[in-house]
Amino acid sequence: MAEHILVGLSSAPSNARIIRTAATMANAFGGSFTALFVRTPNYEAMSEENKERLRQNTTLAQALGATIETVFGDDVSYQIAEYARLSGVT
């Protein structure tokens, strides 16, 4: 079974490095990777600067071969764990 790497998408400046690491891992293991964004009710209150950084990180993940997924919920940790459980990430 091929590896399936999951990486969170965020507006954090460090997220680009994390996305690149996930892409490298997926390539090294001959697998795929998914970039997951958990959209919370706070999304609308995000600054335009943070929304733009999130768009840039999403574009980077797509360019590196990620499948982009978005889920909705209040509890980011729960949503990530539930997505991982249901989608079979390794």
Give the ranges of each region predicted by the language model.
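Small/aliphatic-rich secondary-structure junction motif
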Residues: 2-63, 69
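Structural beta-alpha unit
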Residues: 65-90
